[in-house]
Amino acid sequence: MRMNLSELEIRILGCLMEKELATPEIYPLTLNALASACNQKSNRDPVMSVTEADLLRGLEALGARGLARLTTTGGRVAKYCHSATDNLRLAAAERAVLAELMLRGAQTAAELRSRGERMTEMGDIESVEETLRKLQQHGPPLVVRLPRQPGRKEQRYLQVFAGLPEFPDELDISEEMEPAAGPRAAAGRPAVGNERLERLEEGIGSLRQEIAALRREVQEMMDAFA
């Protein structure tokens, strides 16, 4: 089953999963509470501005995929909840990790551990890495590990509810690291600069090969569960 959710659908699902864990006393959410959660400025990247009409369309799409539903809790006001716990069989720590990735984008295991604590006990860094492995091996995979960015020590993880990312864009290679154009630019470089640039170019080439292999591997895994 491929997700291919829209940005709005991912925001809605992430908010429902977040509020279930972080504020269970107000969960399931009314449409107004869900709008506030989707539009809040803290713990969100990007910040969005959605209307109740947008939310109803997104909830309908999620409902068709078995990821959200309308529920009643004894009152007359319509409330909404997610169905990821049952349909995707996700534990609390797995839902917390996915909620963070949906609401803030790609993050390291350390960032997920720190930020996920507001929703549930995350354990030590090894526990978080094990949770991420389970999500990577889920059928279908729900998370991928991105190639390490140049100059950064830790690798980041990304949810794939919107489908596979364009990995080369995730490398975030700055213009300063790209080779200078033309023979005139090359002639003006000092020898040390040339050596450093060659090493960087080799590293970028290796990264692109790793990206291609990773993309093929993830695509094969997703095809197997399609």
UniProtKB/Swiss-Prot annotation:
SUPFAM superfamilies: Winged helix' DNA-binding domain (SSF46785). Signal peptide: none annotated. InterPro entries: DUF480, WH-like_DNA-bd_sf, WH_DNA-bd_sf. Belongs to the UPF0502 family. This is UPF0502 protein Gbem_0194.
